């Protein structure tokens, strides 16, 4: 039986270090948020959504968006919103500021998914550096656990996953780069 997957790009955040909405920063002439969205969608060949506040820019008008009851409550709230509403077996997450994580890396995450738990991107040179927002989650085996942790007051993803099966998938520092300032994209 083929497992179903969907993709979600986190569009929230204040971009305070960036000085402007980083989703709109051009990478090779294309808004960074769309670079990430297109990389993820190309990799999984399935429904892909932005998660977070309304994106008020014409380039994003055709891209579907998910808004949940925890909107504005940080990344863990967004993860719980997706897990709560997902209709697929697996969900793949990406933050909007990781344009160097290419379709082949997203495919690797999705293909590494297991019957339980989470496949999380980790830095090959610093394995303790996990990138929870670049990850693939088994919806059925993680949904209740994560929502319970959130409802108990937890807001840190690395603490909320305690007790879940975690598989590290290693990538290079460049592939995992978060663009937090305009100079990071040069």
Please tell me what each predicted stretch does.
Residues 2-154, 159-175, 182-183:
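Nucleotide and nucleotide-moiety/phosphate-recognizing core
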Residues 186:
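Acidic two-metal-ion nuclease catalytic site recognized across multiple nuclease folds
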